[in-house]
A protein has these predicted regions:
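Glycine- and aromatic-rich loop/turn segments at beta-sheet edges
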Residues: 131-142, 177-179
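Conserved hydrophobic/aromatic pocket- or pore-lining residues that grip, position, or stack substrates
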Residues: 123, 153, 174
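Well-ordered alpha-helical scaffold segments within catalytic/enzyme domains
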Residues: 152-163
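Aromatic- and histidine-enriched alpha-helix N-cap/loop-to-helix transition segments
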Residues: 141-149, 162
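Membrane-interface coil-to-helix junctions
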Residues: 171-177
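Extracellular/oxidizing-compartment recognition motifs
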Residues: 1-137, 149, 165-170
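Proline-centered turn/helix-capping motifs that create local helix->coil transitions or kinks
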Residues: 162-166, 178-179
């Protein structure tokens, strides 16, 4: 999923918080990704693209939406700092998915092989996740518009979701930087 995480915390006892609460949220596509250390980072893209976020909450109770759009199917929450005399609980945890897709994709024929149907559904979900403000190469990666991704995703979109405005917008963006 690609979108925004909202959560709220509240005290679990009678004592008031005498220090901030610091949490780290890590998003992953597969469970094993959550156990892979991020540091020291050796990737080719900037470290800031990695799907993790550290937040410091100054007072409890508190509700917040992480302002950065994130992507993943799994979430790990780590407690990085808290007063030893205070404890809290999550009161609410929601993830609001986001996409530019507004139309339903056409259904396959009822006689379609189940394996082909499964592949079609995975492809639709992947395309939907990559259709954001532009056709992205992947919501977890760099979120840049690449001409190869535009070509493939626009072709798939033409037969499925038919969001032609997104295709037109991406073409205008690329045309603006032609020279």
């Amino acid at each position: 999923y690609t979108g925004y995480l909202t959560f709220s915390i509240k005290p679990s006892g009678l004592k008031a918080a005498d220090a901030p609460v610091r949490l780290k949220f890590t998003f992953a596509e597969v469970p094993s990704e959550l156990n892979t250390p991020l540091e020291p980072y050796k990737g080719g893209l900037a470290r800031s693209w990695v799907q993790d976020e550290i937040v410091t909450i100054m007072s409890v109770p508190h509700e917040m939406t992480i302002p950065r759009r994130l992507a993943g199917r799994y979430l790990k929450i780590e407690l990085l700092g808290i007063s030893s005399s205070f404890d809290f609980v999550f009161d609410k945890l929601t993830f609001k998915a986001q996409t530019s897709v507004t139309n339903e994709a056409p259904a396959l024929a009822s006689t379609t092989d189940p394996l082909v149907r499964d592949i079609y559904e995975v492809g639709l979900n992947t395309l939907k996740e990559c259709m954001q403000t532009v056709y992205e190469d992947g919501p977890k990666r760099d979120r840049r518009l690449w001409i190869g991704d535009l070509y493939l995703e626009a072709l798939a979109n033409a037969y499925t979701f038919k969001n032609h405005e997104l295709t037109k917008y991406c073409l205008y963006l690329l045309a603006a930087f032609a020279n």
